[in-house]
Amino acid sequence: MKLPWLSPDTPFPPVEHALSDPAGLLAAGADLSLERLTAAYSNGIFPWYSEGEPILWWSPDPRMVLACADFAPSHSLRKLLRQIAREESALLPRVQVRVDTEFDAVVAQCAAPRDGQAGTWITADMQQAYRAWHAAGVAHSVETWIDGELAGGLYGISLGRMFFGESMFTRVPDASKVALAYLVAFLRRAGVEWIDCQQQTRHLASLGARPVPRARFVEHIRQAIAGPAPAWQSGRLDSQGSLHPAPVSTLLY
């Protein structure tokens, strides 16, 4: 089957038309406008390509999903989370989990070269698109701070009651997992059931993520995005999933 080439005004083809080799590739071209990205994510499609390539659009089958109720931290991570929770009421806790205080820095860290990887899919154009989505209140970061330094985190897209995870990074062991645990608590409190993880990896599976048939995934997101989105604000998350809004200046040591 020939890969469809999208002009700016061309709608996406049905996700059932995605190729089997490479698995999930649906189309190429178009742009990264907010309208295009919203249409993509609302239909189970995401962009993934390298610098110098055209924009490639994917909808793999099955789709990796973390059901918030199935989040499964390891014994050591649970122990660390309990320790952080005990200390979070201190005047200046050593570890804080924050929302949207350093979105650009989180994206930049996620895009940085990693051992064993030749390049990054988070191209300059993708970073610009995410920053625009963040300015529009749709893209968000969850950040783990240790002793006033950004130690790890993640970012993703929030549409209604659906969260689409994009990427994670860590400078300190388990820092990104701590951010994920706090995100899960926040989303569960807001009635969000699923986090889209896009592609299957052992790392995600170890945390409770599972493959879901694409048809079921698309059906779920179309219902979920019709619901109200969580009340995202810049501030601090606690271990129970409550977001405490605060100016960035009051959070920095």
Curated annotation (Swiss-Prot):
Broad class of enzyme this protein falls into:
transferase
- Taxonomic classification, please? Bacteria, Pseudomonadati, Pseudomonadota, Betaproteobacteria, Burkholderiales
Name of the protein described by the UniProt record: Leucyl/phenylalanyl-tRNA--protein transferase
Q: Provide the protein's localization.
A: Cytoplasm
Its keywords, alphabetically, are: Acyltransferase, Cytoplasm, Transferase
Name any GO cellular component annotation: cytoplasm
Q: Does the keyword Acyltransferase apply?
A: yes
Query: Highest taxon of the source?
Result: Bacteria
InterPro entries from the xrefs? Acyl_CoA_acyltransferase (IPR016181), Leu/Phe-tRNA_Trfase (IPR004616), Leu/Phe-tRNA_Trfase_C (IPR042203), Leu/Phe-tRNA_Trfase_N (IPR042221)
Q: Which organism's genome codes for this protein?
A: Bordetella petrii (strain ATCC BAA-461 / DSM 12804 / CCUG 43448)
Signal peptide annotation:
none
Q: Name one GO biological process term.
A: protein catabolic process
- Any coiled-coil regions, as ranges: none
Q: Which gene encodes it?
A: aat
**What family does the entry list?**
Belongs to the L/F-transferase family.
Task: Using the UniProt record, give the first listed, main subcellular location.
Answer: cytoplasm
Example GO molecular function term?
leucyl-tRNA--protein transferase activity
Q: Can you state which reaction this protein catalyses? A: N-terminal L-lysyl-[protein] + L-leucyl-tRNA(Leu) = N-terminal L-leucyl-L-lysyl-[protein] + tRNA(Leu) + H(+); N-terminal L-arginyl-[protein] + L-leucyl-tRNA(Leu) = N-terminal L-leucyl-L-arginyl-[protein] + tRNA(Leu) + H(+); L-phenylalanyl-tRNA(Phe) + an N-terminal L-alpha-aminoacyl-[protein] = an N-terminal L-phenylalanyl-L-alpha-aminoacyl-[protein] + tRNA(Phe)
Spell out the Pfam families in the cross-references.
Answer: Leu_Phe_trans
Q: What is its EC number?
A: 2.3.2.6
Purpose of the protein:
Functions in the N-end rule pathway of protein degradation where it conjugates Leu, Phe and, less efficiently, Met from aminoacyl-tRNAs to the N-termini of proteins containing an N-terminal arginine or lysine.
